Amino acid sequence: VLSGDDKSNLKTAWGKLGGHAGEYGAEALERMFVAYPTTKTYFPHFDVSHGSAQVKGHGKKVADALTTAVGHLDDLPGALSALSDLHAHKLRVDPVNFKLLSHCLLVTLANHLPADFTPAVHASLDKFLASVSTVLTSKYR
C-alpha cells in the first residue's frame, strides 16, 4: 500500500522526467533485453537493437501507462484494467517479466536522476512498480 509520502514522492519524481519519459522507457526496455535476453521472446516481430524505432515506440507505451498509473494512484486496478487484460489474456506475458522491467526502470531512473533518487524516492518507486506489477498480473488467475 502506497503511503501519502510515497504518493508525494512519486508525483514529484515523475514530474521531473519531463519530456523524457518515453526515452527512459525505451532505455529500460533495452536494458531488460540485454540483461535478460529471454524477454526478447515476447517481441519476435521487433528489431530489439539499440535505438530501434520499435523499442522506442514500446518504451513510450510503457512510460505512458506508468504516467497514467501515477495519475491514478488511488485506483491502479481501474486505471490499468485494460492493460492487465491484454497482458494476461492476449499477450500471455510471464509475470516475472514485470519484475525484470521494474528493476531496469529503477536503474534507468537512478542513472538519469541521481540527485533526486534518494533512498525514500527509491523505496516509493519500488513500491509503486511492485503495485503496478501486481495489478498487471491480477487477471492471470
UniProtKB/Swiss-Prot annotation:
Protein's UniProt keywords contain Isomerase: no
Transmembrane segments: none
Gene Ontology terms: cellular component: blood microparticle; haptoglobin-hemoglobin complex; hemoglobin complex
UniProt: heme b binding residues: H87
Modified residues (Phosphoserine): S3, S49, S102, S124, S131, S138
Tissues of expression: Red blood cells.
InterPro entries: Globin, Globin-like_sf, Globin/Proto, Hemoglobin_a-typ, Hemoglobin_oxygen_transport, Hemoglobin_pi
Modified residues (Phosphotyrosine): Y24
Keywords: Acetylation, Heme, Iron, Metal-binding, Oxygen transport, Phosphoprotein, Transport
Entry keyword Iron: yes
Example GO biological process: hydrogen peroxide catabolic process
Sites bearing N6-acetyllysine, chain numbering: K16
Protein residues bound to O2: H58
Any matching Pfam family: Globin
Location of N6-succinyllysine modifications: K7, K11, K16, K40
A molecular-function term among this protein's GO annotations: haptoglobin binding
Sites of Phosphothreonine modification: T108, T134, T137
Signal peptide positions on this chain: none
Domain named Globin: residues: 1-141
Biological role: Involved in oxygen transport from the lung to the various peripheral tissues.
Quaternary context: Heterotetramer of two alpha chains and two beta chains.
UniProt xrefs under PANTHER family: HEMOGLOBIN FAMILY MEMBER (PTHR11442), HEMOGLOBIN SUBUNIT ALPHA (PTHR11442:SF48)
Membership in a protein family: Belongs to the globin family.
Protein name, entry field: Hemoglobin subunit alpha
Originating organism: Microtus pennsylvanicus
